[in-house]
Amino acid sequence: MSATGIGTIRLQIMWNRLISVVEEQAQTLMHTAFSPIVRECGDLSAGVFGLDGRMFAQAVTGTPGHVNSMAESVKHFLRHFPIETMNEGDAFITNDPWMGTGHLNDFVITTPCFRNGKAMALFSCTSHLTDIGGLGSGVDATDVHMEGIYIPMLKLADRGVMNETLLAMIRQNTRQPVESEGDVYSLAACNDIGCVRLVEMMDEFDLDSLDALGDYICDTSEKAVRDNIGKLPNGEYKNTMTIDGVGDPIDLVATLTIHDDKITVDYDGTSPKSPKGINVPMAYTTAYTCFGLSCIVSGDIPNNAGSLAPFEISAPEGTILNAPYPAPVCSRHVIGQMLPDVSFGCLAQAAPDRVPAEGASCLWNITMRGATDRAANDSKLFTITAVTNGGTGARPIKDGLSATAYPSGVRGTPVEINETVAPIIFHRKEFRPDSGGAGTHRGGLGQILEIESAIGADFELLAAYDRIDFPARGRNGGGNGEAGSLSFTSGEKLLGKGTQTIPAGKIARFHT
């Protein structure tokens, strides 16, 4: 049935209902996940896709880097496993950084949804597993295979029967076998819940197919975004952002072109790929660039294949923003999450009254690893990622947000959760006074955190931070934000990137 045969009001109701379906999918993932970074912080994505791979709806809960790159993952799944070969009860999995969401820690599971024996849609989801073997989270690897288990596109479940061989491989290649396997099951479960709710919706609205609704969603969204772009002045706008990198600074160079009803962003001139694990696969570059554009151009339009269609993103292969296999990519967020601010620097020239100043941009996740007990024969290790944020840039008509993860959108991990799941103690967690750049509206404040072992033992800090040498810049005459830093409370500095030991009795201090 065509969209015109259903009626606009009914289509709009079904669109909103579909968004609620995928939001329940995401909430199921949060409520069943084992890793605190998922269940407490929402480092995930969830969405429903047409049989042709178009994204029809995404959950409100989730990160842009996962959602927009997961949309590409579904297309890869369909190329490997055509829809006509899928059966009810099948599920497919990968953590391939170039076909998934940018690094090995993110597992993507895609599941076909059947109704009355016929495939109706695909549900897909992503979440971050804290430990997947290898060197662990950080920048130290020099190729992707050092960073953990690498799962190609495989069948996780065949007609409802789980692939126990694959699960055994996952368990054996992680320092957290119970948590990792549990997270895989939570991903599969959330897709199943999404399918159940979709079938209920289709029964309620007497739908035999999602084609008409999907066409309406994508066509309506694309037209709305193109109309908004058409209100901006045509032109070519350039911006360069310099950030810390590893060893040498990195230049992120963007040329944004507005031409009638479309926007292209080209990163030609950006620094080459790094020998360390801060490289970014193209899908992740596209995801965060599109998110930055959407925030200014189409913030009130739901995210789907149609709303993304007017944006075209490119970066020369071999640059840090289009790093080919087997480049190390574990900490790709350190670079990729800068890209909305890079695109804002371009858009500020076309729409100066709508664009915020630069913020902390990338997360300041405090990833720690060590023994759970001081006993020398204790073989059980803890691995934890305490999600931590700086502040956002000042907005055109109000201050920036303090201690807020933008652009990732994840929540900070509560201190109580960190101290419950790992033998660490937080002596301090508070706003960092005067850290937001001054101006008519100031930037959001960062944080001060102080952390020590709770059992008098050494532990490792897997550092991957930025904005230390090159702080966030103000806009339109506003002041820069304060630079980040990390050190011991006794004064000795710690490196912004790289695995380091925090000795027993020492307190590590972080200024975001």
What are these regions (language model features)?
Residues 1-88, 93-512:
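Glycine/proline-enriched, intrinsically flexible loops and inter-domain linkers
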